[in-house]
């Protein structure tokens, strides 16, 4: 009772202070230039991918439909997290209002959840293409692809609504300094002045269901693909089948290795500097590299790109 009264008398935090990626004055300007360049490059690359898919009929296939969704998602990723990162590097400490912080958290969780489900959908598409090629036109017809994409986005939205509501309803009485470059789950839970056991449980369960559930679904698809590829009679056929999956497998490996380490742990390891570095990988580096990874391994995208460059 006394604790409840004490908490009620405390002033609720109206804003948070983001420490940013680095507080070293001697490298902040250089980092700002680097990350601004990466931001613009990411937007350019993913916009180009979406344009190629929309403007070339030979890319109007399920695999590229999902790739277009992924490119859109990557653009949203950097647009949600990069502004506060850049402002922190430009101004030093960045003050973000409570509502803005929760809004950023909401959209970030939406994107993480959506990407998990979307990557699993892309793995299923490759599974059907290689393991059940005769049924591919039926199993991956446009209505199914659209449904999988909608499930991905709505699934991320649902998870985010639950998690963000739990975190936003906690009490934050001070201190209000977040050791991160954007509003993320773990730093916010560390600042709450109320019990967070229930919120941590919700966070952990959602991580298990979304991260591990989609990861295991993706891996099951690739195990089946691997078995099918090994049974193919010719080396050429095996190489062709594997090449259609290699890019996606690289993207999946990078994404899940980082996100599972950060979010799917039963106990938060106090290593925020490490978490910030890992967060940079999947919020900045991965969105920039994904279009390059897909273009380097995909001849159809390369042909479409060459045609576009020739027309221009």
Curated annotation (Swiss-Prot):
Compartments in which it is found: Cell membrane
Membrane topology, as annotated: Multi-pass membrane protein
Gene Ontology terms for molecular function: G protein-coupled receptor activity; olfactory receptor activity
Glycosylated position list: 9, 190
Primary localization: membrane
Keywords: Cell membrane, Disulfide bond, G-protein coupled receptor, Glycoprotein, Membrane, Olfaction, Receptor, Sensory transduction, Transducer, Transmembrane, Transmembrane helix
GO CC terms in record: membrane; plasma membrane
Keyword Disulfide bond annotated: yes
Record topological domains on the Extracellular side: 1-29, 91, 163-195, 263-275
Cytoplasmic topological intervals: 51-69, 113-141, 217-241, 297-312
Regions crossing the membrane: 30-50, 70-90, 92-112, 142-162, 196-216, 242-262, 276-296
GO BP, sorted A to Z: G protein-coupled receptor signaling pathway; sensory perception of smell
PANTHER family membership: G-PROTEIN COUPLED RECEPTOR, OLFACTORY RECEPTOR-RELATED
Role: Odorant receptor.
Family: Belongs to the G-protein coupled receptor 1 family.
Name of the molecule in the record: Olfactory receptor 6Z7
Organism expressing this protein natively: Mus musculus (Mouse)
């Amino acid at each position: 009772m006394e604790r409840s009264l004490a908490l009620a008398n405390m002033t609720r935090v109206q804003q948070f202070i983001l420490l940013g990626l680095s507080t070293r004055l001697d490298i902040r300007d250089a980092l700002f230039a680097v990350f601004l360049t990466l931001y613009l490059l990411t937007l350019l690359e993913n916009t180009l991918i979406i344009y190629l898919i929309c403007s070339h009929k030979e890319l109007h296939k399920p695999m590229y439909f999902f790739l277009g969704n992924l490119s859109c998602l990557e653009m949203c990723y950097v647009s949600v997290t990069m502004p506060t990162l850049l402002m922190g590097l430009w101004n030093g400490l960045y003050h973000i209002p409570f509502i803005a912080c929760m809004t950023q958290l909401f959209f970030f969780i939406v994107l993480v959840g959506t990407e998990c489900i979307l990557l699993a959908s892309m793995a299923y598409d490759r599974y059907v293409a290689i393991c059940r090629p005769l049924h591919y036109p039926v199993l991956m017809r446009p209505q199914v692809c659209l449904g999988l994409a909608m499930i991905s986005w709505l699934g991320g939205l649902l998870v985010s609504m639950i998690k963000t509501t739990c975190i936003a309803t906690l009490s934050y009485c001070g201190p209000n300094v977040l050791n991160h470059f954007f509003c993320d789950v773990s730093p916010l839970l560390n600042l709450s002045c109320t019990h967070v056991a229930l919120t941590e449980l919700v966070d952990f369960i959602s991580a298990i269901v979304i991260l591990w559930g989609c990861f295991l679904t993706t891996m099951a698809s690739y195990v089946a693909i691997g078995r099918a590829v090994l049974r193919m009679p010719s080396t050429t056929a095996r190489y062709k089948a594997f090449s259609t999956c290699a890019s996606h497998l690289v993207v999946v490996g990078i994404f899940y290795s980082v996100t599972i380490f950060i979010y799917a742990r039963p106990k938060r390891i106090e290593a925020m500097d490490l978490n910030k570095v890992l967060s940079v990988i999947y919020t900045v580096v991965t969105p920039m590299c994904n279009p390059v990874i897909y273009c380097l391994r995909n001849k159809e995208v390369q042909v479409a790109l060459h045609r576009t460059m020739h027309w221009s």
